[in-house]
């Protein structure tokens, strides 16, 4: 299949699965707002591996995965009907560890990045060493209090 058509089909399948969950067509209470990041479809369109994450702990993650696995048949027929596919893909849902790891790498990069000149010249007020900030000076000037600078 044409790679461009395959990419369009992948994004449309993810959109259809998300729509089914958001519109309440999936009745399983274990399925609660997962984020679908990518999908790998076989060339013959019979199999699709759907990668997802969600903001949850390990116990909730297991329940969410079980819920998605249990409604995979429904989602397959829902997607097949809406996209008018010749064969409905069999979905396999996989927790996306690579997405979580990429978020951690981004956080580490942000933490190790050098401070900007502005941050060096104007430290955070929480880290203030007793210096007065502009708001305090403004409040004092309005109330008539004079400070030594």
UniProtKB/Swiss-Prot annotation:
UniProt-listed InterPro entries: KH_dom-like_a/b, RbfA, RbfA_dom_sf
UniProt keyword annotations, A-Z: Cytoplasm, Ribosome biogenesis
Top-level taxon: Bacteria
Gene3D superfamilies: 3.30.300.20
Biased composition (Basic and acidic residues): 116-125
Family statement drawn from the similarity comment of this UniProt entry: Belongs to the RbfA family.
Primary role: One of several proteins that assist in the late maturation steps of the functional core of the 30S ribosomal subunit. Associates with free 30S ribosomal subunits (but not with 30S subunits that are part of 70S ribosomes or polysomes). Required for efficient processing of 16S rRNA. May interact with the 5'-terminal helix region of 16S rRNA.
Acidic residues bias locations: 126-143
Disordered: annotated span: 116-149
Pfam assignment, any one: RBFA
NCBIfam families (UniProt xref): rbfA
Gene: rbfA
Species classification: Bacteria, Pseudomonadati, Spirochaetota, Spirochaetia, Leptospirales
Protein name, entry field: Ribosome-binding factor A
């Amino acid at each position: 299949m044409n790679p461009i058509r395959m990419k369009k089909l992948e994004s449309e399948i993810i959109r259809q699965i998300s729509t089914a969950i958001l519109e309440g067509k999936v009745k399983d209470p274990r399925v609660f707002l997962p984020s679908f990041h990518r999908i790998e479809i076989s060339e013959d369109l019979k199999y699709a591996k759907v990668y997802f994450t969600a903001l949850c702990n390990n116990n909730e993650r297991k329940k969410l995965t079980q819920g998605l696995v249990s409604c995979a048949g429904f989602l397959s027929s829902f997607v097949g009907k809406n996209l008018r596919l010749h064969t409905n893909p069999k979905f396999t849902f996989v927790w996306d560890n690579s997405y979580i790891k990429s978020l951690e790498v981004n956080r580490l990069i942000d933490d190790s990045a050098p401070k900007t000149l502005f941050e060096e010249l104007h430290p955070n007020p929480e880290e203030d060493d007793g210096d007065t900030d502009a708001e305090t000076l403004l409040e004092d000037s309005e109330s008539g209090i004079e400070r030594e600078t």
